[in-house]
C-alpha cells in the first residue's frame, strides 16, 4: 500500500502517480528523497491527499480482483490537492478528478485543508470508485442513488 512516507512511487514515476491515480501538480521529495513532511510544509497536503486516494484505489482493486476503469474514460484519476479557497471537496467525472480546497476556520483562525484529511480524501475517492462501477447512479433523479453514493463514501473512509 502507498502512504505519505512512500518512496517507491517517486522512484517508479517522478510525476508522482500510480497506474490509476496521478497528482495534479508537482510534489518534490524531502531532503532524504522521501515524501514525508511536517504538517507545516505545504507539500504535506499533496502527499496526504494523493496517498489517501491511491490507497483507496489499490485496496479496492485488490478486493475486486480487477482494475478500475474510470467513468471519465481517462486512464488516471487526477488528485488536485488545493483547488482554491472553499470549505469543500468533490469528485467531478467530467474533469476526471478529485478536487480539494482550503479555507480559514472561523473559530481557530487556522487554515484548514480538506486534502489533509484521509477521511475526506478517501470519501471522495469512493465517489469516483462507485461511479466507475455504476456510472448511471450519478444521473439518477431518484434520491436513493445519491444517498448510496454518500454512504459508500463514508464506508470507504
Regions found by a protein language model. Give the residues of each.
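Acidic/polar low-complexity interaction segments
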Residues: 1-62, 70-75, 131
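Hydrophobic (often cysteine-bearing) scaffold residues that line and stabilize catalytic clefts
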Residues: 49-53, 118, 149-152
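Transmembrane alpha-helical segments of multi-pass membrane transport proteins and ion-pumping complexes
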Residues: 59, 128, 154-155
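Alpha-helical scaffolds flanking conserved acidic
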Residues: 75-78, 115-118, 147-149
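Catalytic zinc-binding patch centered on the HExxH motif and its immediate surroundings
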Residues: 78-99
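Post-HExxH zinc-binding segment in Zn-dependent metallohydrolases
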Residues: 83-84, 143-157
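Short pre-active-site segment immediately N-terminal to the catalytic Zn-binding motif
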Residues: 102-121, 140
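Catalytic Zn2+-binding segment of zinc metalloproteases
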Residues: 125-140
Amino acid at each position: 500500500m502507498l502512504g505519505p512516507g512512500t518512496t517507491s512511487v517517486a522512484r517508479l514515476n517522478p510525476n508522482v502517480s500510480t497506474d490509476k491515480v496521478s497528482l495534479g501538480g508537482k510534489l518534490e521529495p524531502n531532503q532524504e528523497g522521501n515524501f514525508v513532511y511536517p504538517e507545516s510544509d505545504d507539500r504535506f497536503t499533496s502527499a496526504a491527499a494523493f496517498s489517501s486516494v491511491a490507497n483507496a484505489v489499490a485496496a479496492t482493486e485488490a478486493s475486486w480482483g480487477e482494475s478500475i476503469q474510470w467513468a471519465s474514460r481517462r486512464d488516471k484519476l487526477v488528485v488536485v490537492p488545493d483547488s482554491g479557497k472553499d470549505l469543500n471537496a468533490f469528485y467531478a467525472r467530467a474533469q476526471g478528478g478529485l478536487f480539494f480546497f482550503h479555507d480559514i476556520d472561523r473559530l481557530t483562525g487556522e487554515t484548514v485543508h480538506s486534502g489533509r484529511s484521509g477521511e475526506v480524501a478517501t470519501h471522495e475517492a469512493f465517489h469516483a470508485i462507485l461511479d466507475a462501477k455504476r456510472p448511471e447512479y450519478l444521473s439518477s433523479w431518484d434520491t436513493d442513488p445519491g444517498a448510496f453514493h454518500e454512504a459508500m463514501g463514508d464506508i470507504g473512509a
